[in-house]
A protein has these predicted regions:
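Non-catalytic pre-domain segments flanking phosphatase-related domains
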Residues: 1-17, 239-246
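Conserved Lys-Pro-Asp/Glu-containing loop-to-beta segment of HAD-superfamily phosphomonoesterases
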Residues: 157-188
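Short acidic capping loops at alpha-helix termini that bridge into adjacent secondary structure
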Residues: 46-49, 142-146, 174-179, 198
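N-terminal helical cap/lid subdomain that shapes the substrate entry/recognition surface
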Residues: 10-116
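Structural recognition of alpha->loop->beta junctions
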Residues: 139-149, 211-229
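Acidic, Mg2+-coordinating phosphoryl-transfer loop and its flanking beta/alpha structural elements
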Residues: 179-219
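Substrate-recognition/cap helix-loop segment adjacent to the acidic, metal-dependent catalytic center
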Residues: 39-41, 69-74, 99, 107-121, ...
Length: 246
């Protein structure tokens, strides 16, 4: 449970883990839900507006879904809210039809962390309603200590509020005892801004290694399955050169 950091030793006591693309392999589901949502507002496939909207969606992954739609419909709050509602219904419907599947090794990683007394907080840009649906589908009540969405903390990513809320709620004494893991640039920004010692980008989701490093990743992992090896000891994973502190 110790990680060399800045010449000293930090004990990791909390892992804040992103949901979509990190702990659950639902990237295609999420993309389809975004596409359906903007189509209901008149932005349809095959148009330049659709292409621009989906580029915005990709760049904004990890941020609160309502904020993604506000970026697409900046002058029409009602339209953004309507699109967000369609997104939630589409995504939740997909969960009901197909279920959710974590990437290989994810469940085992959670179990190893919990066995080592590392607390687990799941974080997301989804609404509380959608988060509750995801948690029900996963049946992970015995594997996580807390699950937060933006409305639980104040602001969503790339702000650090969810990480800091988890620190307070779970009684962590020092933000340096936190590891933040995600698949998007906004996850990395949030982790760095929170002061977490470990901000690890995983390659199972939406953004490339380069984007994750741009966001300030301290480590790059193939998947969440590698996290116990990083924070619990054993083989050391080197920090990537060039990770920016933001």
């Amino acid at each position: 449970m110790v990680l060399a950091h800045g010449g000293g030793v930090t004990t990791i006591k909390l892992a804040c883990l992103d949901l979509a693309g990190t702990t659950i392999g639902d990237i295609a589901m999420v993309e389809r839900a975004f596409a359906e949502a903007i189509a209901t507002q008149g932005i349809v496939p095959g148009t330049g507006a659709y292409a621009r909207a989906m580029v915005h969606v990709h760049r904004s992954r990890g941020c609160p879904t309502i904020e993604v739609f506000r970026g697409i419909f900046p002058d029409n709050e009602a339209q953004a809210q309507a699109a967000n509602l369609t997104f939630e219904r589409s995504y939740e419907g997909a969960i009901g039809r197909a279920g959710l599947t974590p990437p290989p090794g994810t469940v085992e990683a959670l179990e190893k962390l919990r066995a080592a007394d590392v607390k687990i907080c799941l974080t997301t840009g989804f609404s509380r309603t959608t988060l509750s649906r995801v948690l029900t589908a996963l049946s992970w009540s015995d594997k996580v200590d807390l699950a937060l969405c933006p409305e639980d903390a104040g602001r969503g990513r790339p702000m650090p509020d969810m990480v800091l809320a988890a620190v307070l709620r779970l009684g962590i004494e020092d933000v340096r005892q936190v590891a933040v893991v995600g698949d998007s640039e906004s996850d990395m920004l949030s982790g760095r801004r929170s002061g977490a010692s470990v901000v690890a980008g995983v390659l199972t989701g939406v953004h490339s290694k380069e984007r994750l490093l741009k966001g300030g990743a301290t480590h790059i992992l193939d998947s969440l399955a590698d996290l116990p090896r990083l924070v619990l000891g054993g083989d050391r994973l080197e920090s990537p050169v060039g990770a920016s502190a933001l």
